[in-house]
């Protein structure tokens, strides 16, 4: 599975999430891709991100499993990724 983040430079929630994502990637091995809605417009829009940024889209072999948007604490973010099977306890 992979996690795709759609964000923007001007998005304050995206900036907040950068540190959460960085910490998550230090602690867990995750296939993670990130697109900027303005700089990577075609790629970002192909995921139909919606109106709330950042949006996190969990993909399994090019099929969307789930998505969630907004700001999360580190623990909330990790919990969401565990719920959908991106992170397993033994990965830590």
List where the protein language model places each region.
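A short beta-strand-turn-helix
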Residues: 1, 41-46
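Local sequence-structure signature of Cys/Sec-based thiol-disulfide redox active-site neighborhoods
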Residues: 1-24
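Structural micro-motif
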Residues: 47-57
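Thiol-based oxidoreductase modules, predominantly thioredoxin-like and allied folds used
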Residues: 5-8, 29-42
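Non-catalytic, surface beta->alpha helical segment in thiol-disulfide oxidoreductase systems
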Residues: 57-91
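Alpha-helical elements of the RecA-like P-loop NTPase motor core of helicases
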Residues: 15, 19, 42, 66, ...
């Amino acid at each position: 599975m992979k996690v795709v983040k759609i964000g923007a430079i001007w998005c304050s929630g995206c900036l907040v999430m950068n540190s959460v994502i960085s910490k998550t990637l230090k602690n867990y091995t995750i296939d993670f891709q990130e697109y900027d809605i303005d700089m990577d417009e075609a790629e970002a829009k192909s995921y139909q991100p919606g109106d709330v940024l950042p949006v996190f889209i969990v993909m399994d072999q090019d099929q969307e499993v789930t998505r969630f948007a907004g700001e999360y604490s580190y623990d909330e973010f990790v919990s969401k990724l565990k719920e959908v099977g991106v992170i397993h306890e033994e990965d830590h």
